[in-house]
Curated annotation (Swiss-Prot):
The gene is aspS. Homodimer. Its EC number is 6.1.1.23. It is an enzyme of class 6 (ligase). The lineage of its organism: Bacteria, Pseudomonadati, Pseudomonadota, Alphaproteobacteria, Hyphomicrobiales. Belongs to the class-II aminoacyl-tRNA synthetase family. Type 1 subfamily. This is Aspartate--tRNA(Asp/Asn) ligase. L-aspartate binds at residues 175, 221, 454, 495. The record marks 33 as: Important for tRNA non-discrimination. ATP binds at residues 221-223, 488, 540-543. InterPro entries: Aa-tRNA-synt_II (IPR004364), aa-tRNA-synth_II (IPR006195), aa-tRNA-synth_II/BPL/LPL (IPR045864), Asp-tRNA-ligase_1 (IPR004524), Asp-tRNA-ligase_1_N (IPR047089), Asp/Asn-tRNA-synth_IIb (IPR002312), AspRS_core (IPR047090), GAD-like_sf (IPR004115). PANTHER family: ASPARTATE--TRNA LIGASE, MITOCHONDRIAL (PTHR22594:SF5), ASPARTYL/LYSYL-TRNA SYNTHETASE (PTHR22594).
Length: 594
């Protein structure tokens, strides 16, 4: 028999009754029932119940066992009595009567419980991550992550993609975040950078004559902590394709992404035909470029109903600013003053003056609008708003007014808040959609200049003619995002593969040819030797796993994450370098600032 086990702790079934087995694992818990000791023995695969009775030579050892000791058990498989069968365990029909127990490793008193999953301070969980990972939910999440990545690889290979690895030590490039810099020992005063994404390398792979590339790529960004992104590093399914249009990317990747969700959705419906929603439409209807389409609320413009009306606040805003609009946020079933007042208080907590509203209720046989706005604009305008929005008895509507560019984010947040408060969001499905036609440029109000809206390497719609003749802020990009349930899970574009077009695009954003040649010399040179039209995308693996597992944050699906202060509490990183290490790197530390 094997030194440690003949079976795993998940394998034994009633068909094994009568056999002698050897199991090894962790002591999950010990229970004393009238002199009999019941030990739940756990390994990577599952749990088996061990029984030690006072007549067994193993009993004296069993009495000493404590949680998370590692033991080996030899014993006989017996059937449980009908009343003791545990239907929640794969091995719940049997138990092993111990003949011999060997302690392989003892455990100190635990700093956090492994049995059960009570809430525990996150810093303790991260410091003792090796214990935290023994807990059932986290253990399953990590295994699911591995299976999801394996499914990605399988589907990409089936779609004709080849997996390539790109360098981890590379040159710094402006991708929208700070680089992690690595000092060079051999080249004094110079630094490598960890890649924020394999963007330039994957385009060079296309120029090199390969047709379809992908990799499970680690990406590194020195960003301030955010709730929806792990500090330091994250992983993405990165891909690129030659000789493709935007629709080619969609038709290739839609079955892959939909299939991954279907494989791990545990029966929840997944969007079959993904809609293409223009960016401007997404902002107008949902107040977000990553809308949660499970929320049925669709915002509409209702400016005409307020122009010249008795509600002077909105009427004056419209009269004094040609850019001003009034948007309506319809809220079916929200027609109570208590709910409307809660929404108004929430808006004030968000730094807004309030949130105007109308709600409708039956007064006898008449459907009437209620609230300050309804009183000021009168029944005819109130009813016109209700008719436009398709609302009725027991429904409500909220309003925001001003320059849409300034209030759109708040309007989107109000839509989300109303949908959640009214339980309008169906949480048992995955709603996927493509967001397309992103602005190529945007206006930086702080610096008073035009800058790239998203990826500077995307192809502008209209090409050189658009760059030379169109107002820059009106130019759209062949840029797209894949969104799911309010999260951006992938982003991509058709690339600008022509060197002069690339230079012109950067010139519009205020950069000259010399800067392009210096910062992107490898790509710029490559484009001068025959570059194919190409495009691709990158999907955030961490977010996809989080969504599929229903995890509350990204740390719940990552094996060894940092905390929100970008510290690895388990390994003690970042740490100070030794004087010798600093000398070899030609680095002298400046005095710490108070």
């Amino acid at each position: 028999m094997h030194r440690y086990r003949s079976h795993t702790c998940e394998e034994l079934r009633p068909s094994d009754v009568g056999g002698t087995v050897r199991l090894s694992g962790w002591v999950h818990r010990v229970r004393d029932h009238g002199g009999l000791l019941f030990i739940d023995l756990r390994d990577h695969y599952g749990i088996t119940q061990i029984v030690a009775d006072p007549d067994s030579p193993s009993f004296s050892t069993a009495e000493k066992l404590r949680s998370e000791w590692v033991i080996r058990v030899d014993g006989e498989v017996k059937a449980r009595t009908p009343e003791t069968v545990n239907p929640n365990l794969a091995t719940g029909g049997v138990e092993v009567f111990a003949r011999e127990i060997e302690v392989l490793s003892q455990a100190k008193e635990l700093p956090l419980p492994v049995f059960g999953e009570p809430d525990y301070p996150e810093d303790i969980r991260l410091k003792y991550r090796f214990l935290d990972l023994r807990r059932e939910t986290l253990h399953r999440n990590i295994l699911a992550r591995t299976k999801i990545i394996a499914e990605m690889r399988k589907r990409m290979a089936e779609s004709g993609f080849t997996e390539f690895s790109t360098p981890i030590l590379t040159a710094s490039s402006p991708e929208g975040a700070r680089d992690f810099l690595v000092p060079s020992r051999l080249h004094q005063g110079k630094f490598y950078a960890l890649p924020q994404a394999p963007q330039i390398y994957k385009q060079l792979i296309m120029v090199s004559g390969f047709d379809r590339y992908f990799q499970i790529a680690p990406c590194f960004r020195d960003e301030d902590p955010r709730a929806d992104r792990l500090p330091g590093e994250f992983y993405q399914l990165d891909l690129e394709m030659s000789f493709v249009t935007q629709e080619d990317v969609f038709s290739t990747m839609e079955p892959v992404m939909r299939g991954i969700f279907e494989a791990f959705a545990e029966g929840k419906p997944v969007t079959q035909k993904l809609p293409r929603i223009p960016y401007d439409e997404a902002m107008r209807k949902y107040g977000s470029d990553k809308p949660d389409l499970r929320n049925p609320i669709v915002m509409e413009e209702v400016s005409e109903h307020f122009r010249g009306s008795g509600f002077k606040v909105f009427a004056n805003i419209l009269a004094n600013d040609p850019k001003a609009e009034v948007w309506a946020i319809p809220a079916k079933t929200g027609g109570s003053r208590a709910f409307c007042d809660r929404m108004n208080s929430w808006a004030q907590g968000e730094g807004q003056p309030g949130l105007g509203y109308i709600f409708w209720r039956k007064e006898g046989d008449t459907l009437e609008g209620a609230g300050p706005i309804a009183k000021n604009i009168g029944p005819e305008r109130t009813d016109a708003i209700r008719t436009q929005l398709g609302l009725g008895d027991g429904d409500a509507c909220f309003f925001v007014a001003g320059d849409p560019k300034k209030f759109v984010a708040f309007a989107g947040a109000a839509r989300t808040r109303a949908g959640e408060e009214l339980n309008l969001v169906d949480r048992d499905r995955f709603e996927l959609a493509w967001i397309v036609d992103f602005p190529f440029y945007e206006w930086n109000e702080d610096e008073k200049r035009i800058e790239f809206g998203h990826n500077p390497f995307s192809m502008p719609q209209g090409g050189m003619e658009a760059l030379e003749n169109q107002e820059p802020l009106s130019i759209k990009a062949f840029q797209y995002d894949l969104v799911c349930n309010g999260f951006e899970i992938a982003s991509g574009g058709i690339r600008n593969h022509m060197p002069e077009l690339m230079v012109k695009a950067f010139e519009v954003a205020g950069f000259d040819r010399q800067m392009v040649e210096e910062r992107f010399g490898g790509l710029y040179r490559a484009f001068q030797y025959g570059a194919p039209p190409h495009g691709g995308m990158a999907a955030g693996i961490d977010r996809i796993v989080m969504l599929l597992r229903g995890a509350k944050n990204l740390r719940e699906i990552t094996m060894f994450p940092m905390n929100q202060q970008a510290m690895d509490l388990l390994m003690g990183a970042p740490s100070e370098a030794t004087p010798q290490q600093l000398r070899e790197l030609h680095i002298r530390l400046a005095p710490k600032q108070d």
